[in-house]
Amino acid sequence: FSIGNSMEIIKDIGPAVELEDYKVAEFEGSHGLAHTRLATESRVDICYSHPFWARPFPDIAVVHNGQLTNHNKLRRSLQRRGYEFSTTNDSEVIAVFIADQLLNGLTLEESLIESIEQLDGTFTYLISTTDGIGFAKDRFSTKPLIVAENKSFVAMASEEVALHSMISEDTVLYEPT
């Protein structure tokens, strides 16, 4: 969760219903990321659970659905420029890649567009910064992203069922392109 000057990341392994153990309903913030995942490419380990922090940037985090085929090449390129990684997970590469783009003067929107050019594979990801949140999808929109929006909130998920508890009569559901 972010309130514009800090971000808190909670990681755990277990069912989403255990999230309430962390009293997230009491958090204050303008935006947040949450993620449940079925590990397909990396081991089931709390270090590999989402969201991923873009080290050493304390205000950038990413959640990702998909697989990057060029994450090792991108990781090596970023490591040569001094970045360090905590895992071998492809999602962490996205976080550091975007942080690097922002550090080099691109806006969040420009960084997201650049990621579509540079990341190879099938993916949809959400990224949170101190003052905003954004998303990117691969060119073929292989991985789904559903948005639920009304006057009170905007929520995104890779499956519509994850949004059902938030939907009211004035909520609009759509899949962005």
Give the predicted meaning of each segment:
Residues 1-177:
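Conserved short alpha-helical segments that host acidic/polar catalytic motifs at enzyme active sites
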